[in-house]
């Protein structure tokens, strides 16, 4: 299943809780979650986790080289590394570094290392998730440190690499929902609406209300440049 699913809703609606349940970080107090018809708690835990790549809001980078931060001990496929680095929008930054992929991500232990910005670290975490050969990709606000235009461009590129993978995205910026096959709208810890972008806009419900409110915000704050893309 290579369905691309976006999860949206107001703060506290249950979006991240839903993802934590999928990853077995929480156990359901009611009902069950099935994967291929099998309760997810019946899978061996480590085997289950190998099916997932994830990027959370509290992503981490380490005082290792750029290459090691992306591959994290996995076999190095140079072409694939270059591909995910470019898709994440980190290629120009790495090419500008004296040691390229060998540059240490921090000056904590190496004065020749490089300090990355929050947005650059987030891109590295995204590249790491894309590098892992997993069947399911989960991204919880993966682009929060990026501006709306950079996020829009990144999603457009990223989805190309996710062919053949089931993908879940949580985002407060609703324009990226246009790239997804399905949007789940959470409210009060339940799924209130379910459908593609066009269907939900025609429904004129909660999703349409949030989308239009956000588009109006961008029109005011970005002089129409972002809103033009979104509409």
Per-segment meaning from a language model:
Residues 23:
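Helix-to-loop junction immediately C-terminal to a conserved catalytic motif
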